[in-house]
Amino acid sequence: MKSHYFLILLFTFSSYFMQAQSDPNFPVQVKIESGMIEGNYDNRTGLQTYLGVPFAQAPIGDLRWKAPQALNSWTGVKITKQFGPRPVQAEVFGDMYSRSAGMSEDCLYLNVWTPANRDTKGLPVLVYFYGGGFIAGDASETRY
């Protein structure tokens, strides 16, 4: 009986460590106009992802209802591995699933997926504005 417990324990720990070592992502950094950002490289897809990259100052306080203002530069490395917050709104559709970091008026973020093996020439760019009629949705939702 004791050997069964030992085998179960051994299997549990070995499964955990095998899963931890099989993580296909590793960090990648790139310099943009405002500073350095760090995203992930996915070995399975060959894509670099940068999620929640700010593109303007937060539209709060004196900046509320104003045109977007240029982003201030930062020092150090900004981690961009999670979707930014979604706009303040209700999830009106029952099948909505958001992967964002909560809700906020500060929701001016981009998500970038780029091939890691790209040449130095320009690549086609797709800009996608998700639906929702200004009442629902965000860039982290899987349907978009």
What do these predicted regions represent?
Residues 1-25:
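Bacterial Sec-dependent N-terminal signal peptides
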